[in-house]
Amino acid sequence: MAIQGNTKLIAIVDDDDLMRSALQGLLKAVGLPAQAFASAEEFLQSGQQRQTACLIADIRMPGMSGLELQAKLNAEHCRIPTIFITAHGDAKMRMQALRAGAVEFMAKPFDDEVLLESVRVALES
């Protein structure tokens, strides 16, 4: 499933090295420019927010959580279509993320094709 026409960055924020690497490889395999960050703080310090077309973020991370990152970006009027991924989500967390503007909320492990479809939707939003 190639996703064409995107030149803006897809940012991956996850504290798990293997997950970051796998997601970055998946996105690059379909022709999408992806950059991985080990924490929300690292992403914010990178200055890449305005160049980011889609954010894939873990919910639970040391330091700033994915939900806190989304709230900070929203407060700075930086609305990035966000896909949350988590190994430990619940219905309340899902609703909180979606109400704050998330495009999708996915439980790990997830199907690669479902994630890529969510990225496509995010890029079109």
What is the meaning of each model-derived region?
Residues 1-11, 17-18, 24, 113-125:
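Non-catalytic signal-transmission and effector/linker regions of two-component phosphorelay proteins
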Residues 50-56:
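Active-site beta3 strand of CheY-like receiver
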Residues 108:
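A Lys-centered signature of the CheY-like receiver
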Residues 58, 86:
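Active-site residues of response regulator receiver
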Residues 61:
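Receiver (REC) domain active-site loop signature in two-component systems and cognate sites
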Residues 38-39, 65-68:
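Acidic catalytic/metal-coordinating carboxylates
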Residues 17-35:
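Two-component/phosphorelay signaling modules centered on CheY-like receiver
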